[in-house]
Curated annotation (Swiss-Prot):
This is Cyclin-dependent kinase C-3. Residues 27-320 form the Protein kinase domain. Belongs to the protein kinase superfamily. CMGC Ser/Thr protein kinase family. CDC2/CDKX subfamily. The keyword ATP-binding applies. Signal peptide: none annotated. Keywords: ATP-binding, Kinase, Nucleotide-binding, Phosphoprotein, Serine/threonine-protein kinase, Transferase. It catalyses: L-seryl-[protein] + ATP = O-phospho-L-seryl-[protein] + ADP + H(+); L-threonyl-[protein] + ATP = O-phospho-L-threonyl-[protein] + ADP + H(+); [DNA-directed RNA polymerase] + ATP = phospho-[DNA-directed RNA polymerase] + ADP + H(+). It is an enzyme of class 2 (transferase). Its EC number is 2.7.11.22, 2.7.11.23. The gene is CDKC-1. The active site is at D160 (proton acceptor). GO terms for biological process: positive regulation of transcription elongation by RNA polymerase II. One of its GO terms (cellular component) is cyclin-dependent protein kinase holoenzyme complex.
Length: 324
């Protein structure tokens, strides 16, 4: 990805799975619970402690392409982040016989499989997203924003907030932000890929080609999740990027230099055409819901990213202060 690669030598797997690391034989696999770009995820049990865990298997291509840089970045970020609403990476384990290459620190010389060991969570938010009570919605949204605020104050963008990446445990009482595969550290003057965030939760600035962006991209995704909680269906279920923009503009209005200074300079702005109606009418579809909840959604889904509410300010909003 343009502007996304870590400099050579900046990340070494040996820093996280040193020689002598435990092997996956220390776990008993129970069942497969998922599959991603780089491998499978299993529910497992630590045969020593009896604790359940989630094993994310990272398949290496016989050393031909080395250890995926995206996974190395995810490991590094998760080792840095420590918050009750962020999934905890407990350790890295290896397949039996896995060995370092010459020198013992070159991640490109690893052989076999590497496993990321996470704390086990019962299920993801998708299972409750369309049938949660108002009090549950508030509880989940508060935890999501707390985890996200912690990421942002530590200069980390998640860049893939969606129901499948929000995990629930503790009898439905604990939410944790997970899957940091697209996450990355950020600076205000950085340039990043805009091919991130699942389409339904992707903000307009990325759809218009922006490469200089910050925390507001995650806030848009949170706003989409919040709206989906209330409506019990996705807010912007586009099938293509163009259709996604059209659905956003239908509810949030058409962007121009008046409501979003600088928008006309974005690479894909000239390719879009005004939709009808162009007036913002987002609040109209939430007229039967709690006014404080609607106010917060409205502030999360502002077209101009510089005007979107921050995670910190969202946590201070009237929605979280008022009793149900």
């Amino acid at each position: 990805m343009d502007g996304e690669e870590a400099p050579p030598g900046a990340l070494n797997l040996a820093d996280y799975a040193p020689a002598g690391a435990r092997t996956v034989d220390c776990f008993r696999r129970i069942r497969k619970i998922g599959e991603g770009t780089y491998g499978e995820v299993f529910e497992a049990m630590d045969i020593i402690t009896g604790e359940r865990a989630a094993l994310k298997k990272i398949k290496l291509d016989d050393g031909k392409e080395g250890f995926p840089r995206q996974i190395l970045r995810e490991i590094k970020l998760l080792k840095k982040l420590d918050h009750e609403n962020i999934i905890r990476l407990k350790e890295i384990v290896v397949s039996p016989g896995t060995a370092h290459g010459a020198g013992g620190s070159d991640d490109y010389m690893y052989r076999g499989d590497i496993y990321m060991v996470f704390e086990y969570m019962d299920h993801d938010l998708k299972k409750v997203l369309h049938h949660s009570t108002p009090s549950q919605v508030k509880y989940y949204m508060e935890q999501l924003l707390k985890g996200l605020h912690y990421c942002h104050v530590n200069n980390v963008l998640h860049r893939d907030i969606k129901g499948a990446n929000l995990l629930i445990s503790g009898g439905g009482k604990l939410l944790k932000l997970a899957d940091f595969g697209l996450a990355r550290p950020f600076t205000r003057d950085g340039s990043f890929t805009n091919h991130v965030i699942t389409l339904w939760y992707r903000p307009p600035e990325l759809l218009l080609g922006a490469t200089n962006y910050a925390e507001a991209v995650d806030i848009w995704s949170v706003g989409c999740i919040f709206a989906e909680f209330l409506l019990r269906k996705p807010l912007f279920p586009g099938r293509t990027e163009q259709e996604q923009l059209s659905k956003i503009f239908e509810l949030c209005g058409f962007p121009n230099e008046e409501n979003w200074p600088g928008v006309s300079k974005l690479p894909l702005y000239k390719t879009i055409r005004p939709t009808t109606p162009t007036k913002r009418r987002l609040r109209d579809i939430f007229h039967n819901f709690d006014s404080h909840a609607v106010d917060l959604i409205d502030r999360m889904l502002i077209l101009n990213p510089t005007e979107r509410i921050s995670a910190h300010d969202a946590l201070c909003a009237a929605y979280f202060i008022t009793k149900m």
